[in-house]
Amino acid sequence: MAMQSETPGNPASTVDPAEIAKFSKLSAEWWDPTGRMAPLHKINPHRVAFIRDAACRKFDRNPKSLNSLAGLRMIDIGCGAGLLCEPFTRLGAQVIGIDPSATNIAAAKVHAEKSRLLIDYRNTTAEAMDPRERFDIVLAMEVIEHVTDVGAFLGRCAAMMKPTGLMVVATLNRNWKSFALAIVGAEYVMRWLPRGTHQWDKFVTPEELTRHLQNSRLAVTEQAGLVYNPLADKWNLSADMDVNYMMVAESAG
């Protein structure tokens, strides 16, 4: 399959070309639950449940329903190969997945076709999206630690929300613990990810993320951490936000 440019041109883009190249190399491994993306596969059910439950509370839906998100428009910014797009499509959402890496989008399209799912995948950036498009749910999961300007990026994400919509952001805290676990542990000891996947100085503290969201006229309504138990080899939602964490934000009115 022929690939187009990896970085859709946009003068205001917050995309970092080096980050795109890094994740493009991993595109063939996205859907291997035992490969380098194994940690994402293990945390994915918890991410899906957290987002689903937040959306159901917001839009008065039954989280136990197989179509709990039916009719809701969702965009997953930096969707990779679609690990979140597919489960939310199965829950009834109308999903658009965007990624600046053409190879990631190609991998996403192939897997969606195999899974017989209709997902609108686009090789583009948040900044290049039609400003008239609005969504009930905007996802920016494990993305902001890879952009060049967090505030500008989140401002663009906020502009894509409907007035009654919500945004969910996931990222990594910046402290000694996240350096030890997310970089030394994940990249050098466990070798879950290639060395250099993350840059510790680009991690974002919950306080910083909250301020960025407030600057975009959003208010944080929910938050949770994701904690790894090495003895059980399992991830769980937790109040501990020292390393991986997620936030839900809505219009501050």
UniProtKB/Swiss-Prot annotation:
Keywords: Methyltransferase, S-adenosyl-L-methionine, Transferase, Ubiquinone biosynthesis
Keyword field contains Methyltransferase: yes
Keyword check for Transmembrane helix: no
Major enzyme class: transferase
Reaction catalysed by this enzyme: a 3-demethylubiquinol + S-adenosyl-L-methionine = a ubiquinol + S-adenosyl-L-homocysteine + H(+); a 3-(all-trans-polyprenyl)benzene-1,2-diol + S-adenosyl-L-methionine = a 2-methoxy-6-(all-trans-polyprenyl)phenol + S-adenosyl-L-homocysteine + H(+)
InterPro entries for this protein: SAM-dependent_MTases_sf, UbiG_MeTrfase
Annotated GO MF terms: 2-polyprenyl-6-hydroxyphenol methylase activity; 3-demethylubiquinol 3-O-methyltransferase activity; polyprenyldihydroxybenzoate methyltransferase activity
Pathway of action: Cofactor biosynthesis; ubiquinone biosynthesis
Gene3D superfamilies the record matches: Vaccinia Virus protein VP39
CDD domains, A to Z: AdoMet_MTases (cd02440)
Residues of the signal peptide: none
Binding residues annotated for S-adenosyl-L-methionine, in chain numbering: R47, G78, D99, M141
Cystine residue pairs: none
EC number per UniProt: 2.1.1.222, 2.1.1.64
Annotated GO biological process: methylation
Pfam short name (any one): Methyltransf_23
Family from the record: Belongs to the methyltransferase superfamily. UbiG/COQ3 family.
Task of the protein: O-methyltransferase that catalyzes the 2 O-methylation steps in the ubiquinone biosynthetic pathway.
Annotated protein name in UniProt: Ubiquinone biosynthesis O-methyltransferase
Gene this protein is translated from: ubiG
